[in-house]
Design a protein with these regions (language model features):
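N-terminal periplasmic accessory domains that precede
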Residues: 132-135, 152-157, 168-173, 188-191, ...
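Periplasmic-side early beta-strands and strand-to-turn transitions of outer-membrane beta-barrels
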Residues: 209-210, 230-231, 239, 251-340, ...
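Extracytoplasmic beta-strand/coil segments of soluble accessory domains associated
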Residues: 96-116, 133-176
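Gram-negative outer-membrane beta-barrel transporters
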Residues: 460-467, 552-560, 578-655, 719-720
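Short acidic/polar hinge/loop motifs at secondary-structure boundaries
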Residues: 176-205
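Face-selective signature of the C-terminal outer-membrane beta-barrel domain
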Residues: 306-322, 342-479, 492-494, 549-556, ...
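Conserved C-terminal beta-signal and adjacent last beta-strands/turns
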Residues: 253, 301-303, 341, 353-355, ...
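Outer-membrane beta-barrel signature, preferentially recognizing the C-terminal barrel domain
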Residues: 333-355, 395, 442-448, 496-498, ...
Length: 727
C-alpha cells in the first residue's frame, strides 16, 4: 500500500513561541520557505528580529574572515615549535593522501584516474561531524536532502525523488553496503558504524561500473574503519544534544604479541526529536492546526567487530534504526506518532589477503541481510475520525557475495588488476497488509543472481604519463550482458601539476522495489523496466603551491539514458517507475585549500552545473545550479584545542510540484580538544548558528512540496580512555 518513504536530516521546532506569535507568523514563514525569501530570524522567548538577507550573508563571510585572521595569528605564534612536535605518522599524512576505492589497489590520490576527496578521522573530529551525511554536506559538489525520515545524497546537481541513494555505491572497508531490495544505503543515524570508528572516507566522483558493476553510477564512497592498533585502548564516549538527544559508545581495540588484532564496539542513540513541528499544508483544526506533536523521534543501535590475524580479516556489522515520521507521507494520518519505519542492516565478511609471488591477491566471501518494516496509519474513509487502520509494509533481503581480485606489475610499465564476482540473492521479499481488519495487498518473493569479470591496466607510457583502461562484463539473471568500459589518462605536467581525463560508461539495473512492488490502491509494478545507463566525460587539473596550498578545477559532462524515474501509470493512475527521456548533466567546479604544519587548514569550493531533459529542455527537480562550501579549522593551543567553522550554500531548486524552492546558507561552529587531560577528549558543536529557516524538496509521497529543516542546535561529546595498552 505504502511505498517505502524517502529522505533524511533533522527539522526545526517552530512551535516554541507564545501562541499569539505563532499565529501571526505561520503563513509568513511558509511563504518565505517556498519563495526562498532570505530572512534570518534571531529569536528569544519574546522577541523576533528580522535580519535582511544581505546583512546575514555578509555576517557569514565576515565571521569566517575573522576566524581566519585569528587563526593566522595563532599559527604565527606557534609556528616554530609545531613541526618538531609532529610524529612521523602525522608528517606522512600531511604529505600523501592514499586511496583504494578508485582502482581497487592502494595508490596516491593524485595518481587515481578520477576526481577524489579524502576526509580523515582528524577532520571528522575537528568539524564534529555527527553522521556521514554531515561529512558529505561539506564536500565539493555534494548536497544532502532530508525529508524527516531518510537522508538522500545528491552529486553535482543530480538527485532523483524515490532514490534511496541507489545511484551511489557505498562501501564499508570495500564491502558493498547498498541492500538488495532498494539498492539503498543510508547516511544518517542509520549508517552501520559509529563515526568515531572511521579512519578515512574516500569520495570518488563519477561512474565506476568498470570496477564495481551496477550501482556505481555517479560516485563511489568507501568508508575505511580503524583497526585495533589505532586504539590500543578501551574507550567510552557519551554525548548529549538538542531535542533530548543522547548517545553512548563503548569500544575496545588492541593488537597482541601473537599478531591477533581486534576492534569491538557498540553504540546506542536516542532522540525525542522536535516536540512540535509545524506544517502549513495541514493547518486546520482537524489536523491539530498543522502541528505534529511528539512525532519526530529517532532511535538506533549498532555493533561492529573487526578481527585480523595474519592474512585473514573478519568483519561483523549490525545496525538498526527506528524513525517516527511527522510529515504524513503516503497519505497517512497527520499527527499520529504511530507512523514509523525501522531499517536493520548487517553482514559477516571474511577476507583473505596474500602475496603470491608478484601477485597481490584478495579473496572475499560475505553473507548480508537487510530488514525493513514500517507502520503507516491510514484513514481510508477520509473522515478524520478514529479508529484508523494500521498498514504494515516490509521488505527482507539476504544474499551471498564472493569476490576475487589480483594485481601485479608486468613488464615494469603495466599495473594489471583483474577480478571476478558472483552474487546470489537468496531472498527478496516484499510484503504489505492491513493489520486490523486484515487485508493482504502484496506478498512477493524473488531470487536473483549476478556474475561478473573485470580487467584494468594502468600503462605508464613514460615517467609522468599514464594511460588507464578498464572493462567489466556483468551477467544478470534478468537482463542481458552489460559491458562497462573506462578510459583515463593521468599526466604530471610538472612537479606540482596533475592533469586527468576520464571517459566511462556505467549502468544501474532496476531493483526489486522499482520492478515488482505493486499494491492495487498504491503502486504499480513494472517488470519491463530496462537498466539505466550513463556516459561520462571529465577533465581535471590540480596544482600544489609548495607544501601548503592546493587548487583544482574540473569540468564534467554526463548523458543518462533510460533513467528510471517515478511517474504515473496512465491505466491505473497509481505511481509507477518508468524509463524516462535522456538527461544531460554538465558543469564545472573548483576547490582551493591550504594545510599548514601547525594544524591551521581551510578549504573553499564551488560547483556550477546545469541538468536538463534533452527531449524537453526542462530543468531537473532537486538540482541546485550552484553549491559552495567553506571549511576553516584553527589550532588555538598547540594542536590540542581546535576551533572550526564550516558553511554550505545551496542555490534555488525546482520541486516535484514544479515550484521554486529558495536557496540558503548554513554555518556551523565546532570545537575539539585532544587529550583535555591524559585520558579525556571533549568536542562540541553549534549547528546552524544563525538559526536559518530553510527547507528541502520532498518527494512525490509528500503533500508538502518543501520539508522544513533544523534550526540552531548543539551537541557536546566526552570521550574517556580508562586504559591504554602498553604494547
Amino acid at each position: 500500500m505504502c511505498a517505502k518513504p524517502e529522505s533524511v536530516s533533522a527539522s526545526r521546532e517552530r512551535c516554541c513561541w507564545p501562541d499569539e506569535v505563532q499565529a501571526t507568523n505561520r503563513n509568513r514563514t511558509s511563504r518565505a520557505l517556498q519563495s526562498g525569501a532570505a530572512v534570518f530570524d534571531v529569536r528569544s522567548d519574546l522577541v523576533r528580529v528580522r535580519v535582511p538577507a544581505f546583512w546575514a550573508r555578509s555576517a557569514v563571510w565576515l565571521f569566517l574572515g575573522a576566524m581566519f585572521f585569528v587563526g593566522s595569528a595563532a599559527a604565527q605564534e606557534s609556528k616554530k615549535g609545531d613541526l618538531g612536535g609532529l610524529s612521523l605518522e602525522d608528517l606522512a599524512k600531511m604529505k600523501v593522501e592514499s586511496v583504494y576505492g578508485a582502482s581497487k589497489f592502494l595508490q596516491q590520490a593524485s595518481d587515481a584516474p578520477t576526481s577524489v576527496t579524502v576526509v580523515t578521522a582528524e577532520e571528522i573530529q575537528k568539524y564534529d561531524y555527527r553522521t556521514l551525511a554531515d561529512v558529505l554536506r561539506g564536500v565539493r559538489g555534494f548536497y544532502v536532502i532530508y525529508d524527516r525520515n531518510y537522508t538522500y545524497v545528491g552529486v553535482r546537481g543530480f538527485s532523483r525523488p524515490g532514490d534511496y541513494n541507489a545511484r551511489i555505491l557505498f562501501l564499508l572497508d570495500g564491502h558493498r553496503v547498498n541492500d538488495n531490495i532498494y539498492d539503498g544505503a543510508y547516511v544518517g543515524s542509520e549508517f552501520p558504524v559509529d563515526m568515531d570508528l572511521i579512519e578515512r572516507i574516500e569520495i570518488i566522483r563519477g561512474p565506476h561500473s568498470s570496477a564495481y558493476g551496477a550501482g556505481a553510477f555517479v560516485a563511489v564512497i568507501n568508508v575505511i574503519t580503524k583497526r585495533g592498533r589505532d586504539l590500543r585502548a578501551n574507550e567510552v564516549s557519551t554525548e548529549a544534544g538538542s531535542w533530548n538527544s543522547y548517545k553512548g559508545r563503548v569500544t575496545y581495540g588492541d593488537r597482541f604479541d601473537s599478531g591477533l588484532e581486534t576492534l569491538l564496539s557498540g553504540s546506542l542513540y536516542n532522540s525525542q526529536g522536535h516536540k512540535n513541528l509545524f506544517f502549513p499544508e495541514f493547518n486546520s483544526p482537524a489536523a491539530n492546526n498543522g502541528i505534529a506533536a511528539d512525532a519526530d523521534g529517532d532511535q538506533a543501535y549498532s555493533g561492529f567487530a573487526d578481527i585480523i590475524y595474519r592474512d585473514f580479516n573478519i568483519h561483523f556489522v549490525q545496525n538498526s534504526r527506528t524513525k517516527h515520521i511527522p510529515t504524513a507521507s503516503f497519505d497517512t494520518v497527520f499527527n499520529d506518532p504511530r507512523t514509523e519505519t525501522t531499517d536493520a542492516r548487517g553482514y559477516l565478511d571474511v577476507q583473505y589477503r596474500h602475496l603470491f609471488g608478484a601477485w597481490e591477491t584478495l579473496g572475499r566471501a560475505s553473507y548480508d541481510w537487510y530488514d525493513y518494516h514500517g507502520i503507516y496509519v491510514m484513514d481510508y474513509a477520509g473522515l478524520g475520525i478514529p479508529p484508523y487502520t494500521e498498514n504494515y509494509d516490509a521488505a527482507n533481503g539476504s544474499w551471498l557475495d564472493f569476490q576475487g581480485d589480483a594485481s601485479r606489475v608486468l613488464a615494469k610499465r603495466h599495473k594489471v588488476t583483474l577480478g571476478t564476482e558472483f552474487r546470489q540473492d537468496l531472498r527478496q521479499h516484499q510484503l504489505n497488509y492491513d493489520i486490523q481488519p486484515y487485508s493482504l495487498y502484496l506478498d512477493d518473493h524473488r531470487t536473483a543472481w549476478m556474475a561478473a569479470f573485470y580487467l584494468q591496466d594502468e600503462y605508464v607510457i613514460r615517467k609522468r604519463l599514464a594511460f588507464v583502461a578498464g572493462l567489466r562484463s556483468d551477467w544478470h539473471k534478468k537482463y542481458e550482458t552489460t559491458l562497462s568500459p573506462r578510459l583515463g589518462i593521468v599526466f604530471q605536467a610538472g612537479a606540482n601539476t596533475d592533469l586527468k581525463g576520464t571517459y566511462s560508461w556505467a549502468f544501474r539495473a532496476p531493483n526489486s522495489f522499482e520492478t515488482f512492488y505493486s499494491v492495487s490502491i498504491s503502486n504499480t509494478a513494472n517488470p519491463l523496466l530496462k537498466p539505466e545507463r550513463i556516459r561520462s566525460w571529465e577533465l581535471e587539473a590540480a596544482h600544489r603551491f609548495g607544501k601548503t596550498y592546493h587548487f583544482s578545477a574540473a569540468g564534467f559532462l554526463n548523458r543518462i539514458d533510460d533513467l528510471i524515474d517515478p511517474g504515473i501509470d496512465p491505466v491505473t493512475g497509481n505511481p509507477i517507475y518508468l524509463n524516462s527521456a535522456p538527461i544531460q548533466n554538465k558543469g564545472i567546479e573548483w576547490e582551493l585549500g591550504g594545510k599548514c604544519a601547525n594544524g591551521l587548514e581551510g578549504l573553499i569550493s564551488h560547483t556550477l552545473q546545469a541538468s536538463r531533459s534533452i527531449a524537453t529542455g526542462d530543468v531537473l527537480t532537486n538540482s541546485p545550479k550552484q553549491t559552495a562550501k567553506v571549511n576553516l579549522s584553527i589550532p588555538l593551543v598547540q594542536r590540542k584545542f581546535f576551533a572550526s567553522a564550516d558553511a554550505q550554500y545551496i542555490s534555488r531548486r525546482r520541486t516535484v510540484a514544479q515550484t521554486d524552492l529558495g536557496g540558503y546558507a548554513v554555518v556551523n561552529l565546532t570545537f575539539f580538544s585532544r587529550k583535555l587531560t591524559e585520558k579525556f577528549d571533549i568536542s562540541g558543536g553549534l549547528y546552524n548558528i544563525f538559526d536559518k529557516q530553510y527547507a528541502e524538496s520532498g518527494g512525490l509521497e509528500h503533500q508538502e512540496t518543501s520539508i522544513p529543516q533544523d534550526g540552531r542546535s548543539f551537541r557536546i561529546k566526552l570521550t574517556y580512555r580508562p586504559h591504554l595498552s602498553a604494547r
